[in-house]
Amino acid sequence: MSVDEILTLAQGVVQSWDWATEVSRPRPERLDVKVKEIKQLLPIIVGLRVKRLGYLSAIVGVDLGVEANEIEVIYYFCPESAVIALRVRVPRQGATLASLSDVIPSAEVFERELREMFGIEITGLHTTDHLYLPDDWPDGVYPLRRDFDRAAIAGAGDEV
């Protein structure tokens, strides 16, 4: 299948949730999907998986700042040389997303990173141990948030 055929098929899957999504093609090889209702994220991902439309290449967080009071989470799927980006916004405080690890086992490492670096609670994780940060890292301090304060971590990670 060509890249255009792949993305057209993916767009067809996503359009099943047209009330909950906004779709754009910013470049010929890319499909961007803004998921407006968090509860629709998992069914859309399952729909893409059923059609074998790529592998999960990354889940990334982007802190939109204190003023926006949101974090955007982007799920990247790569079928061949195409890119499908599913974007969902969550509140900076008390954000919760369901784990994809039962559907896509490799998602767990990305989800643990979101939890640790941005403070997004991921329900259904198989382990909640620290992935990158030291065990004595202070609770409630998230290093990839824009308002991260280095003074809050004085001494963290000093134990050997």
Short names for language-model regions:
Residues M1-V160:
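Terminal low-complexity/charged segments
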